[in-house]
Design a protein with these regions (language model features):
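Conserved PLP-enzyme active-site core in the AAT-like
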Residues: 29-196
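A glycine-/small-polar-enriched, mobile loop at the entrance of the PLP active site in fold-type I
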Residues: 1-23, 28
Length: 196
């Protein structure tokens, strides 16, 4: 009754977690997923065949694997660029670029990226940005405050802290992105289970 009518679409337990995650990151809307990779899968589903995705050239191996073995096969044009060189990043943006994917510090090389500068470049080009904030957590870094559009977490790691729960998260401020992610989370079935 009321807000919740089908648990995959939403339930009070998951909503409480999503609201907490959004508050931690300073976001308007949070989404909880079964795993960090489920969160990544949902974020990548924002893209269509022919879209161009810019990714920093050092990133988590699981992300590299999904990009090269799944997204590329689905027609997403993936380009790896050293985003520590902001000029190279700006030059890599094309008319079909839809998303800039970052993590900082990176896994495994611990590269530090200037999220505020990357977000400014992306906004000038009309491109969305995503930052995997798993390593620093919202305690040390809040990418939305720096202009990033989507924050991603593997909540299995520092947010959970004990590795006894597996999960992922996406947090946004943009209502259009929130609506699209809500539809994708429900349609793809990637949501966190209510008892996790």
């Amino acid at each position: 009754p009321g807000t919740f009518d089908y648990t995959r679409s939403g339930n009070p337990t998951r909503r409480a977690l999503e609201d907490c995650l959004a508050a931690l990151e300073g976001g308007n809307r949070g989404f909880a997923f079964a795993t960090g990779m489920a969160a990544e899968t949902t974020a990548l589903a924002l893209l269509s065949s022919g879209d161009h995705l810019l990714v920093h050239d050092d990133l988590y191996g699981g992300t590299y694997r999904i990009l090269t073995s799944v997204s590329a096969r689905q027609g997403v044009q993936i380009e790896f660029v050293n985003m520590r060189d902001l000029e190279k990043l700006e030059q890599a943006i094309r008319p079909e670029t839809r998303l800039i994917w970052t993590e900082t510090p990176t896994n495994p090389m611990m590269n530090l990226l200037d999220l505020e500068a990357i977000a400014a470049i992306a906004k000038r080009a009309g491109v969305w940005t995503l930052c995997d904030n798993t390593f620093l957590s919202p305690y040390f870094q809040r990418p939305l405050d720096l202009g990033i559009d989507i924050v991603l977490h593997s909540t299995t790691k520092y947010i959970n802290g004990h590795s006894d729960v597996v999960g992922g998260a996406l947090i946004v401020n943009n209502p259009e992105l929130a609506d699209r992610l809500a539809l994708l989370q429900n349609t793809l079935g990637t949501a966190e289970a209510p008892f996790d």
